[in-house]
Design a protein with these regions (language model features):
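Residues forming the Rossmann-fold NAD(P)(H) cofactor-binding site
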Residues: 1
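N-terminal Rossmann NAD(P)H-binding glycine-rich loop of SDR-like oxidoreductase domains
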Residues: 4
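Adenosine-nucleotide cofactor-binding segment
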Residues: 8-75, 123
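Generic beta-sheet signal
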Residues: 17, 39, 87-89, 120, ...
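Glycine-rich phosphate-binding loop and adjacent beta-alpha segment
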Residues: 27, 71-145, 179
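Structural signal for short hydrophobic segments within the conserved structured cores
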Residues: 34-37, 118, 147-151
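A structural signal for short, well-ordered beta-strand elements
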Residues: 103, 151-154
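C-terminal capping/lid region of NAD(P)-dependent oxidoreductase domains
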Residues: 144-151, 159-179
C-alpha cells in the first residue's frame, strides 16, 4: 500500500490489486486509490485480470509497479500504453510454485510498445535514501500515511507468520511479537 500512497501523494491516478474484499476496501476507502482489482473475486489468470484492468484503465497504463508477476504482469503488458515503464520488484506468484511457472505469453509487447521494464531493489537507490526518508517522514508527521499490520504472538508463531506472507493471510505488515 505504500507504493499506492506515494503515487497518490504525488498526484497520480492509482489502480491497485488486492487479494480479498477487506484489503480492497482498505485500499479504496482508506488509501484513496482510484480503482481496485480484487483478484480473488475476478480470478488471477491473465484473461480475467486483463478484462478487469481494461475496465479500470480503458486508456491503458503508463507506470506499473510489480510485486506479483504471472498473470498480473501479463495483464499489465496488455494494458500498457506505448513507452510505459515497469518497475519489477517481486514475483510472489512464483515463489510457492512446485514447478517452473511459464512467463507471460505476450512479452513481444515490450518491443511493439517500446516498454521499459527494470528490476527494482531499494539498495540500488541508496544514494536517494536521505531525500526519500525526509519526504516520507514529512508525510508521516502530517498524518498522510496509513497502514495496517497483522501481529502473531510468540516465537512459535514465526513459521506461520512467514508462510502467511505467501498465502495472503496478513493485512499489511506481518509481525511476530516476542514479549
Amino acid at each position: 500500500s505504500l507504493v499506492c500512497q506515494i503515487a497518490k501523494l504525488k498526484g497520480h491516478k492509482v489502480i491497485a490489486s488486492a487479494g480479498g474484499a477487506e484489503k480492497a476496501r482498505f485500499l479504496k476507502d482508506e488509501i484513496g486509490v482510484d480503482a481496485v482489482i480484487d483478484y480473488k473475486a475476478t480470478g488471477d489468470d491473465a484473461a480475467a485480470l486483463t478484462a478487469a484492468l481494461a475496465e479500470a484503465a480503458p486508456d491503458g497504463i503508463d507506470v506499473y509497479f510489480d510485486n506479483v508477476g504471472g498473470g498480473h504482469l501479463e495483464a499489465a503488458l496488455n494494458a500498457a500504453r506505448p513507452y510505459a515503464r515497469f518497475a519489477i520488484c517481486g514475483m510472489i506468484s512464483m515463489y510457492n510454485a512446485e514447478a517452473p511457472v511459464p512467463g507471460p505469453s505476450n512479452m513481444a509487447l515490450i518491443i511493439g510498445k517500446n516498454l521499459r521494464l527494470e528490476g527494482f531493489i531499494v539498495s540500488t537507490h541508496w544514494d536517494m535514501r536521505g531525500d526519500f526518508l525526509k519526504e516520507l517522514g514529512a508525510w508521516h508527521s502530517q498524518g498522510k500515511l496509513k497502514w495496517r499490520q497483522t501481529v502473531l504472538e510468540g516465537i512459535a508463531s514465526a513459521p506461520d507468520a512467514f508462510i502467511g506472507l505467501f498465502t495472503g493471510a496478513n493485512m499489511g505488515k506481518m509481525l511476530v511479537k516476542l514479549a
